[in-house]
Amino acid sequence: MHGLLLAGLAAALPLGVAGLPARQQSGLSPRGIDINAYRFASMAKYSEHKTTSQMVHSFSYSKDDDYVATATKLVKSTFPNMTFRTVKDHYIGTNGIGHVHFKQTAHGIDIDNADFNVNIGRDGKVFTFGNSFFEGEMPKTNPLTKRDFSDPVKALHGAVKTLKIPVKPESAKAMPMKEVETFKFEGTSGALSEPKAKLVYLQKDGNLHLTWRVETDVGDNWLLSYVDAKESETVHNVVDYVASADYKVFAWGLNDPTEGQPTMIKDPWNTTGSGSPFTWHGDGQMDYTVTRGNNVPAQDNPSGGSQWENNYRPESAELSFVYEYSEQMEPEQYKDFAITQLFYTVNTFHDVLYTLGFTEEAGNFQMNNNGKGGQGNDFAICNAQDGSGTNNANFATPPDGQPGRMRMYTWTTAQPSRDGDLEAGIVIHEYTHGLSNRLCGGPANSNCLNELEAGGMGEGWGDFYATAIRLKQGDTHDTDYTMGEWAANQKGGIREYPYSTNMQTNPYTYADVQGMSEVHGIGTVWATILYDVLWNLIDEHGMGKNIMPKFVNGAPTDGRNLAMKLVLDGMTLMPCNPNFMQARDAIIDADQALTNGQNKCALMKAFAKRGLGSNYKHGKNRVNNFDMPAGC
């Protein structure tokens, strides 16, 4: 699986998916009420950059305006007869784009699902914008004048009854808050905080409806229920702040369909640390109901073309990505399952690497870096069943600030054909090209693994991470693993030897690189050495049972994650276009920095076993050295 390096890959197009006005809802509630039956309809429009630049080229700017003033002018010029307010959450992102949000009003009352967002570029001009403003007939009279609407307590009763919310409202009293027609309810029980209500308009079916927005947080659901302000038994729409998602996939650690069955996994980002603060389906600006988020947009690409933004993705309003797969099906028949699997694998690996040090500042792949450094705007574009090739896969890694691109192909070596998206090792191998190219030489330089030996290590790192992750509880130092065996339908896999600590099973040493002229062969030697490193550290520290490592003083407590951490840290230390010896030294240096060198002997035992001993001298001819350093 060649990791294609395209340093000149164009930057991502502006986002073109209209977002709903709140986070995704969680589907069937524990009370048997289908919350999704009350979802908002999507009404937003979005003008991407190319269209925007053509539309607003004659827009009047003043060099004295700040980005908020410029954004406000655009809204006024677009809807000159409408009223709105500026939401107090504007900011300039790390990419230099200013973000300003507006809320439409009628008679001073918010239209709760009528928004306008404007993004201002570094040059002070409108970059992109979107809106869901109501353009129908406005109410002629101010409801606050006649006050012909129900008491908010009735709205609370209506929401509780209709949606079976476990709140007892019998003794509720509405206490006014600072905002106009906003109340909190005292005397209730069952909620985690006092319920609230606010009078708002809601656009639905081409009309405005006056409603009480009743807020109830009961843990499993945190609902905003839009109760009709005159007929309290009518609930127009519901928003649930609690984001929940289900995926039917081969779970993390299962390399391919031969190792287990697909299972249901719920909200996996809850178990993968802080790498995905917006969950896997949000980017801090929008929430998505498809296989897209801050880290990954995953889609099919049967044409093999360069366009990806509008390609097909599985969609689920309730974020339930549950699809069927069987080995008798052709890949096209299970593309929803394959895209979901790709989305799950890449997101999980992103989060694992994040905890190990592949963060925003290190150049990781995220659209929104959330103010934590790095360039952002560079998630990993992942194409499933890409039609540009077969029997392979690739990953393009431009410098930080430009998206990576993964192309996963189907394999025609079996009948029916097999989809590489279902072999996690292939996906992990490809994503690791992004890791190594961003870390070696720094995030801004993707040209540091171009030399033959360095390029070979790039391939080897991919196999190493893929193999380390697929280890199972009960595996031992004597367990062997192949690479690509399932997808290729080839017993023994696609490498010359399986990864093994047994010198009879895999006899590779560093001297074997001498006669090689292709990166995958060199990579197999490097990954073989690292497989010995991996098992030496597991023998010392154990394997660990959790997806995410536990840390003491910054070091993973188990050997598997410690090995992955040291290899990752080593990438950040080694020079541009390193050789094996320099990479060996960088890993040892990484251990010195992390653990004060506690694992030096375990590391050197692995390197020396495969010919990179302490007295190895790099030269034109690669001659093995099996010496251990003094003290070991």
Swiss-Prot record:
Its EC number is 3.4.24.-. One of its GO terms (biological process) is proteolysis. InterPro entries: FTP_domain, Fungal_virulence_M36, Peptidase_M36, Peptidase_M4/M1_CTD_sf. PANTHER family: EXTRACELLULAR METALLOPROTEINASE MEP (PTHR33478:SF1). Its cofactor is Zn(2+). The active site is at E430. Keywords: Glycoprotein, Hydrolase, Metal-binding, Metalloprotease, Protease, Secreted, Signal, Zinc, Zymogen. Residues 20-244 form a propeptide. GO terms for molecular function: metalloendopeptidase activity; zinc ion binding. Binds 1 zinc ion per subunit. Secreted metalloproteinase that allows assimilation of proteinaceous substrates and probably acts as a virulence factor. It comes from Arthroderma gypseum (strain ATCC MYA-4604 / CBS 118893). It is found in: Secreted. This is Extracellular metalloproteinase 2. Belongs to the peptidase M36 family. Residues 1-19 form the signal peptide. Zn(2+) binds at H429, H433. The keyword Metal-binding applies. GO terms for cellular component: extracellular region. Glycans are attached at N270.
